[in-house]
């Protein structure tokens, strides 16, 4: 999977709460074009949270496709994600989309890519985007070694990613299930 130089999305589940966060920076070449973009959303009547890293237009198009699949499969996130990944890999139009997504409901958390990947992590922590490795590392350390809430873990992980990754800012949007 190629590294997406665009943003950071981090998602953590703990004590029945699922929290997703995304930074607001949009970078075009070497310039910051916007500092307050919204790259995370709630879908399917607010029961599923989704975030994307990569091209904004592509990420939004994929969110729309995922929402269609969720409606078709009555909110079954795993089934919708697998069907989206199959379409994404085989459809001529979708194959060109450059984004990676994370999605979660109250029970499952998934990374979805155009390579056909639908990955559920071993631990309830995922992060994607250019600052994803930093955010995931910080979130895993906090998850394993503290009693912080999911929200506190996500906030701190995003803060750390924003301090290290030049494509990630500290203008964080958070959604919670």
Curated annotation (Swiss-Prot):
Superkingdom of origin: Bacteria
Catalytic residues (UniProt): 7
EC number annotated for this UniProt entry: 3.4.25.2
Family statement drawn from the similarity comment of this UniProt entry: Belongs to the peptidase T1B family. HslV subfamily.
Biological classification of the source: Bacteria, Pseudomonadati, Aquificota, Aquificia, Aquificales
Catalytic activity: ATP-dependent cleavage of peptide bonds with broad specificity
Function: Protease subunit of a proteasome-like degradation complex believed to be a general protein degrading machinery.
Entry's localization field: Cytoplasm
The protein's assembly and partners: A double ring-shaped homohexamer of HslV is capped on each side by a ring-shaped HslU homohexamer. The assembly of the HslU/HslV complex is dependent on binding of ATP.
Positions with a binding annotation for Na(+): 162, 165, 168
MF terms (GO), sorted A to Z: metal ion binding; threonine-type endopeptidase activity
Organism name: Persephonella marina (strain DSM 14350 / EX-H1)
Record NCBIfam families: ATP_dep_HslV, PRK05456.1
Protein's name according to its UniProt entry: ATP-dependent protease subunit HslV
PROSITE patterns: PROTEASOME_BETA_2
One GO term describing the cellular component: proteasome core complex
Ranges that cross the membrane: none
CDD domains according to UniProt: protease_HslV (cd01913)
Activity control summary: Allosterically activated by HslU binding.
Main location: cytoplasm
Keyword flag Cytoplasm: yes
SUPFAM superfamilies xrefs: N-terminal nucleophile aminohydrolases (Ntn hydrolases)
One of the Pfam families matching this protein, by short name: Proteasome
């Amino acid at each position: 999977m190629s590294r997406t130089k665009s943003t950071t999305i981090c998602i953590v589940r703990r004590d029945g709460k699922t929290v997703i966060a995304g930074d607001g920076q949009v970078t075009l070449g070497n310039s910051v074009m916007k500092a307050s973009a919204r790259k995370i959303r709630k879908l399917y009547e607010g029961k599923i949270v989704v975030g994307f890293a990569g091209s904004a237009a592509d990420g939004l198009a994929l969110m729309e496709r995922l929402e269609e699949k969720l409606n078709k499969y009555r909110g079954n996130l795993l089934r919708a994600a697998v069907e989206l990944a199959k379409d994404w890999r085989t459809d001529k139009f979708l194959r060109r989309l450059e984004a990676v997504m994370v999605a979660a409901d109250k029970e499952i958390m998934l990374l979805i890519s155009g390579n056909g990947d639908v990955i559920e992590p071993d631990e309830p922590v995922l992060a994607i985007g250019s600052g994803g490795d930093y955010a995931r590392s910080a979130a895993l350390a906090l998850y394993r070694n503290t009693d912080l809430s999911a929200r506190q873990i996500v906030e701190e992980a995003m803060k750390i990613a924003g301090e290290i990754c030049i494509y990630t800012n500290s203008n964080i949007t958070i959604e919670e299930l």
